[in-house]
Amino acid sequence: MFLFSRKTKTPISTYSDSYRAPTSIKEVYKDPPLWAWEANKFVTPGLTHTAQRHVDPDALQKMLKCAVQDYSYKGSIPSHPYFPEKYWLCPEEADRCNPNYLCGNPNYLCSNQYNTWRMGPYNCWNKCTTYLPRLPKEAGMETVVRGMPLVYPPKPERLNAYEREVVVNMLNSLSRNQPLPQITPRCGCVDPLPGRLPFQGYESACSGRHYCLRGMDYCVSGPPCTERRLRPLCTELPTVRSVSPCEHRSGMQCAVITPQPSYYPCPNLRWDTSHFKKTGGSQRNNYVVHPEFVSETYPDYHCW
């Protein structure tokens, strides 16, 4: 039988053989364990730097190419009636389309490495045109017209009177260094205005070439002889071969340079090439006048 003290709650035995010295149960303060500094499982871990992984550029390009092919060929509209998968040939159909099918060679597809275009999805042709289904009726003419090639009207070779006057006035202003005159619009192809004679080109005495307008007879005001042939801007320069030797030194040849004539207001057209285009590669002094000008395509027309 044990008795407990109220203060210490120490068991006291009534028997001497079971006596035990009284001890206090007062708790002694100790440092808390290190569990407070351990990782807290209930706290969300923060962001950490991912390890730098090696990226193969070739594999990346291959993946990109495959993604582009999938997007291009499968289409973005699920209900589109023309999926390319519908037109790939299965081995049986490819065998029937094979020209050697009737020759008794059924293993031609398996042995021919160049025959994969019949069944491949991307780098291949699709089915033959005879295998393609008809266009849906609800598509209407809009689908048919979208697939037709555009036919452009032919370029007219001859110009009407209004266009003729525009081009001729431009040429006259370039040759005389004058501003463009005011053009009165006219509709339709009418006869040339009174006092204008048809021409097919003009000659430049400076360059010695004949300039023509392709596909038209343009009209220039004034007599034909004065409008067709430009006034000579520079006389023929004698060269070393054509000049006699100088008198003060025997056996020496030199070129005689004559000054430019001052009676013509326009600068030398030989070097004024702002409205000209040089052609012929290394060929000198060969120009084509815009628009639609071709040099040396017509013979030399004399005044009539």
From Swiss-Prot:
GO terms for molecular function: alpha-tubulin binding. It comes from the Eukaryota. Microtubule inner protein component of sperm flagellar doublet microtubules. Interacts with alpha-tubulin. The lineage of its organism: Eukaryota, Metazoa, Chordata, Craniata, Vertebrata. It is found in: Cytoplasm, Cytoskeleton; Nucleus; Cytoplasm; Mitochondrion. Keywords: Cell projection, Cilium, Cytoplasm, Cytoskeleton, Differentiation, Flagellum, Mitochondrion, Nucleus, Spermatogenesis. The keyword Repeat does not apply. It comes from Bos taurus. InterPro entries: SPMIP6 (IPR028195). Belongs to the SPMIP6 family. GO terms for biological process: cell differentiation; spermatogenesis. The keyword Ubl conjugation does not apply. Pfam families: SMRP1 (PF15181). One of its GO terms (cellular component) is mitochondrion. This is Sperm microtubule inner protein 6. May participate in intramanchette transport and midpiece formation of the sperm tail. May play a potential role in somatic cell proliferation.
